[in-house]
Amino acid sequence: MNYPIMKTLILVLCSLHCFAIYGQTKNETFAFHYSNKNYSTFLQETKIKLGNIRASYSAGTLEEKDSCIHAAGILLEESFTKGAFHFWLGTEWDFNGTTNTPKVGQIACGYFVSTTLKHVGFNLNRYRLAQKGAYDEEVYLCGKQTIITIRDQTPNDLKNYFKSNLTRGLYMIGLANHVGYLFFDGKELYFIHSNYGSPDCVVIETFEESEVSNSTIFCVAPLSNNKELMRKWIENELIVVP
């Protein structure tokens, strides 16, 4: 048996399955704005947009700075839901995966989070952040005071909690043995993560349908709605991870 060819075939099938999951969303939540461009072009355009916000922020009044922080939150949300996630979709999962390039090599769940954040412009060490536990990742990135901890609830309970208590935006979620992104569009709760279940690759799926979403604990922290984190992104401030 030709194992390299079999591995390639499995990865291709995995990618197709991941795209099939994406296709089931059937709305504009994850409309891919960069389908005719490569990853480097997408990152460069994100850098330019962030630079424009940074220039306005630097010259702005307190009120204008607050508007820039809001604009950065919108940019972060769109950079992921309509850009970064799609480039990484189908990248093979591995517990020790640390690839820096989408669809080339393997990526572990923590490295998927830290690497994509690094790529869109956060000043952080992707290795140190990924090597922390999910809760500690959220503490260093988002701030301990922003974390919502929910115990002994089902994935559907978490979705209902979002509907009742939280607003549209990009979030980070830590589970008992896993970490990834959540995106809440006001109605549906999506889980974007490097999946160790089936298929074992980066996927976009509804949270309650995920094979790995059953957990005794959910730790949720805001990203796009996190003013302090958006300030750090704009100011290129180092996110310290011991």
Region locations from a protein language model:
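Conserved active-site beta-strand-loop modules that form the wall/rim of enzyme catalytic pockets
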Residues: 11-12, 122, 170-171
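Low-complexity, Gly/Ser/Thr/Pro-rich intrinsically disordered linker/tail segments
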Residues: 189-190, 194-199, 203-242
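Bacterial Sec-dependent N-terminal signal peptides
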Residues: 1-26
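N-terminal capping segments
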Residues: 25-130
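...with weaker cross-activation on analogous glycine-rich loops/strands in unrelated enzymes
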Residues: 132-204
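Residues at the C-termini of beta-strands that transition into short coil/loop
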Residues: 19, 128, 195
